[in-house]
A protein has these predicted regions:
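Amphipathic alpha-helical interface elements
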Residues: 1-176
């Protein structure tokens, strides 16, 4: 493939992702956004902590679905342990995973007003990345938008950490 074809494909994939994210149910949107965050976290860990010689087969042994780095929680802990971000970011990532799991594994959790989803989402309201309002008086669609904004903002910040080259970019302000 040429560079133009690669870029065209990447743009098409990004557009399809956002179209799907906007048009899906709350359950699907939360799962999809969190999967994207999880993928970025895996890229960050692989790029920053594993040698270039770590091929896809080896990476699957390390980070495949049933591997030690196969879960969002384990990836969050690993990234923190190796100094890719601070304790607060680790806890935010893990809590996003808890909310995602409520939607993924509970058939009656369809929006953010489900009591268990609300309780877990409230733990994110004062986070240092993108705080937001959560509560029974907030419309579920507003909570959804704020939650997705948090996930996307965190994913973008992790991507910046992954792409940062200190010799070229200078010191990086670490994630809390």
């Amino acid at each position: 493939m040429t560079l133009r074809e690669d870029l065209t494909k990447a743009v098409e994939e990004i557009n399809a992702y956002y179209k799907e994210l906007e048009g899906e149910s709350t359950r699907a949107a939360v799962i999809l956004a969190t999967c994207s965050l999880e993928d970025e976290l895996a890229k960050l860990i692989r790029f920053k902590k594993f040698p270039r010689e770590c091929n896809d087969d080896t990476w699957d042994i390390i980070a495949g679905p049933t591997a030690p780095l196969g879960s969002l929680k384990n990836r969050a802990n690993f990234g923190f342990a190796f100094g890719l971000y601070g304790e607060k970011t680790k806890e935010i990532i893990k809590q996003i995973g808890v909310v995602r799991n409520k939607f993924a594994h509970w058939t009656n959790a369809r929006d953010f007003h489900h009591p268990d989803v609300m309780r877990e989402t409230e733990k994110l309201k004062n986070n240092v990345i993108s705080s937001f309002h959560v509560g029974p008086s907030e419309p579920p669609l507003v909570i959804r938008q704020q939650f997705l904004w948090l996930v996307q903002t965190l994913e973008d910040r992790l991507e910046r950490v992954r792409g940062h080259i200190e010799e070229l970019d200078g010191p990086l302000t670490p994630l809390p």
